[in-house]
Structures are given as structure tokens and as C-alpha cells.
Amino acid sequence: MSDNLAKAISNPLFPALDSMLRAGRHISTEDLDNHALLSDFELELSSFYQRYNTELVKAPEGFFYLRPRSTSLIGRSVLSELDMLVGKVLCFLYLSPERLAHEGIFTNQELYDELLALADEKKLMKLVTNRATGSDLDKEKLFEKVRTSLRRLRRLGMIINIGETGKFSISEAVFRFGADVRVGDDIREAQLRLIRDGEAVVHTKEPSQGSLLSEEDQEEQAQEEMTEEGEA
């Protein structure tokens, strides 16, 4: 073990940071201390995670995350279609002028309204149930599912909750859901096409669409959903 690697893993921040990365969290520049640790020891920690057949990735936007290979010793699961669609709409909002106008802060309702405005409503309703007709009850169920998706994406470091008011800011990590853009193309228009063409609701096992949610996180989510249903 190199001196630098020993220094990295002996850092008091490392145990919690390692757990977050293994659970699928993206470490963005907003997380100053953890991001600095990864930046300072990127080479050494990349070698460390290779032992688990997992790649420590630094995205062009500056955030870090783990990408397990098929033979990885670190498990991963795939996000739902709605999770991915919400992620793509979050990316669209991140690129929008509204983000500056709102000082980077959005509400759950604003995200939901944007989702309804940008995506095919019939496809959205099918994510609630195949028998959905677009009734007020179906829309309420969709809103609850969107809130669940936002909680999952928060665990992955895509959004940052602001208090308990249903408000959040969007991390640059949402570019995991960004459209591939050629030089000279309008990235926001490309993202809009990605949403409207229906690509955002196609289930895929591409690494760029994969979550790294641990089994523990999935169990916690299931318990949350059951609690919400009980309260309803």
C-alpha cells in the first residue's frame, strides 16, 4: 500500500465517504470536504476501487461516483423508468434560465408541473398503472411516485433538500441523465428532445442509467412507501 493511499483511507472522513460511494451516492462540488478528499487522492483511490472491479469516475462536470463492472464485488441495481425520467427533467431544469431566477431552488410541485408539461402524459399515467385514465386520483398517485423518485435521487446525491419545505436545489450530478450533445448543439434543446421523444422512459441497463443503491437503501425505500400508503 502506498503512503498516499494509506493517508487517504486513514482520513477520518473516508469511512463515511466510502459507504456513501458504495451506496451509489454522487459526490459533487457542494460536498466540499469529501470532494476535496477524492480530488486529492483520485489516483490512489481509483486503484483502491479497482480491486473491487469498480471504477471511480470523475465526470466532466466535476462530480465523482462509483461505476461497478459486471464482475464487481460492489452491488448495483437499476433505477425505475420514472426515476430516470425525473432525473432527465431535473437535468433540464438545471440547464434552464428558471434555475437562476429561482436562485437554484425548486419545489416538488414545480418539478411535477414541469414533468407534466414536458413528457407524454399517457406514458406517465402508465407508470402509475396500466389502467390509469388520467383522473385526479391517478395524478395524485403519480405525484406521490414522483416524490418517491425524488427521495431516491436525493440519496444518490442528485438533489439537496432545503429544510422540510418540499424545496430542493439541483446538483451537477444530474448530468448522469444528460443527453449526448454534439459540438455546437444546444444542450437544453437536446435534453428536451430526449424527454419528449420518449427515450427517458425506456428501461435500460446502460451503466450511465444504473443506480448503485444498496439492498439496505432499497429496503428503506420499500418501508417508506408502505408507510406512505398506510398514512393515505
From Swiss-Prot:
Localization (cell): Cytoplasm, Nucleoid
Domain of life: Bacteria
Comp. bias intervals (Acidic residues): 214-232
Family of this protein: Belongs to the MukE family.
UniProt subunit comment: Interacts, and probably forms a ternary complex, with MukF and MukB. The complex formation is stimulated by calcium or magnesium.
Function as written in the Swiss-Prot or TrEMBL entry: Involved in chromosome condensation, segregation and cell cycle progression. May participate in facilitating chromosome segregation by condensation DNA from both sides of a centrally located replisome during cell division. Probably acts via its interaction with MukB and MukF.
Official protein name in the record: Chromosome partition protein MukE
